[in-house]
A protein has these predicted regions:
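N-terminal Rossmann-fold NAD(P) dinucleotide-binding loop
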Residues: 12-13
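Aromatic pocket-lining residues of Rossmann-like dinucleotide-binding sites
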Residues: 19
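ADP-ribose/adenylate-binding Rossmann-like module
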Residues: 66-70, 77-93
Length: 93
């Protein structure tokens, strides 16, 4: 299953790290975040380094998107997921 993560603060990082450890069942294709460089720096120790994607790209390429972004971003995220018929799991406020 191809998983995309939106938001890469403390929650997004922990979600990505756990999925990376369970990589036989799941595959994180990448992350969308306001801070692109943070993704590269924080995932250098992962089994598979993560790629940065735009919001459109991550919703289009993922089977499931996990929303770890601040609640203010939810409306835009859910609209993109609806546009691309992508399943959405939200773990943020």
């Amino acid at each position: 299953m191809k998983i995309g993560i939106i938001g890469f603060g403390a929650i997004g990082f922990d979600v990505a790290k756990k999925i990376d450890q369970e990589k036989d069942q799941f595959h994180v294709i990448g992350v969308h975040s306001r801070t692109k460089n943070k993704i590269i720096d924080k995932t250098s120790s992962f089994n598979s380094p993560l790629k940065y994607f735009s919001l459109d790209e991550i919703c289009k390429k993922s089977d499931v998107v996990i929303d770890c972004a601040p609640k203010e971003a939810f409306k835009e995220i859910i609209q993109k997921c609806l546009d691309y018929k992508t399943k959405l799991i939200t773990v943020s406020g």
